[in-house]
Amino acid sequence: MVHSSMGAPEIRMSKPLEAEKQSLDSPSEHTDTERNGPDINHQNPQNKASPFSVSPTGPSTKIKAEDPSGDSAPAAPPPPQPAQPHLPQAQLMLTGSQLAGDIQQLLQLQQLVLVPGHHLQPPAQFLLPQAQQSQPGLLPTPNLFQLPQQTQGALLTSQPRAGLPTQPPKCLEPPSHPEEPSDLEELEQFARTFKQRRIKLGFTQGDVGLAMGKLYGNDFSQTTISRFEALNLSFKNMCKLKPLLEKWLNDAETMSVDSSLPSPNQLSSPSLGFDGLPGRRRKKRTSIETNVRFALEKSFLANQKPTSEEILLIAEQLHMEKEVIRVWFCNRRQKEKRINPCSAAPMLPSPGKPTSYSPHLVTPQGGAGTLPLSQASSSLSTTVTTLSSAVGTLHPSRTAGGGGGGGGAAPPLNSIPSVTPPPPATTNSTNPSPQGSHSAIGLSGLNPSAGPGLWWNPAPYQP
């Protein structure tokens, strides 16, 4: 009993000893796990290629090698714990990459709205390295980044294309009118050509104005067409009129070509002008050659108003129409009146009517010619002087009382018979006498019978 009682305490004593031994062994195991825990943490970053397949064999073998007699069950669960935080970290990285891609897309869209048409690849290149540098945890998983990079590259290539239609169209310069002339020389050339072709077609300037009013709804006056042909309009107005006149000219020429082949309807219908207007077409203008014009000028200098027979003769000589020659002479006479209006109507006395008195003209001796007033007065003064000298010599000179007679007075002059012919009737008319003699002028004031108080010395008579 004593032995049994002694044995019991020994057994009891042994159990605490074994418990103490186990407690002593367990701290070593805890220290091993504590010592190996950081190693596992250090080894996990080294095995970066496969973060999802973490093998706990290394730590478990260590624990078994250090304490093969110890129980390995409680030491196995701690190693998988460090692998669990990597899964949320990878998910965070994926979400971070998606956020970076969304931010990049927003930036690209903002740039598209603000600055359309610019290339967006340089800011994307700056964004990608920054995202890669700010997320170093994404480097051990390159396969996870292939899809976002491809989608971002596709966005880079597709978004500028989508932005192309949104670009505002460039302000194009207004196209210049194809018929607008560039300078004044072209306008001058067109004005000359237009006038020649209009005359060739037989249209007047008024016809052109009416036809253009019929076509374009705005009547142009004959003055406007005339000023256009004479280049008397402003450059702007001529530029506006040029395409309209050119279109009318082309239409008129086309119509004249078509009308050169008469149809039955045209033969039966009355003559119509351009665009259905009543026939106002005139005869084509006749162009007279230079040699014919010289011949007509010579004929005009010879006779300004030929008769009908003379006009017919001139037309046969020049191989022209009689009406053309007649119109030319009429126009030439009008031109002569404008150039020299005085020579057109010479003042010739008619044989049956008495000539009217003019202060500038005097008709001596039958009115054969005209003499100026100064020449007529000089001839009259010469005649008066001759007559007065002849009268003075015919009268006897006054004699004083002589001797031997007792101082008798001389007889009066009126008792002496006068041999002076009676003066004709005095008149101031300058009309010629029927005998063609000079006009008689009263010489009553020059009569020598008035006494000795003469105001001239009579010349001696020389028979």
Curated annotation (Swiss-Prot):
It comes from Mus musculus. Residues 41-60 have a biased composition (Polar residues). This is POU domain, class 2, transcription factor 2. Residues 75-85 have a biased composition (Pro residues). It comes from the Eukaryota. Disruption phenotype: Mutants show normal development of germinal center B cells when infected by influenza virus. Highest in B cells, but also present in brain (neuronal and glial cells), intestine, kidney, and testes. The keyword DNA-binding applies.
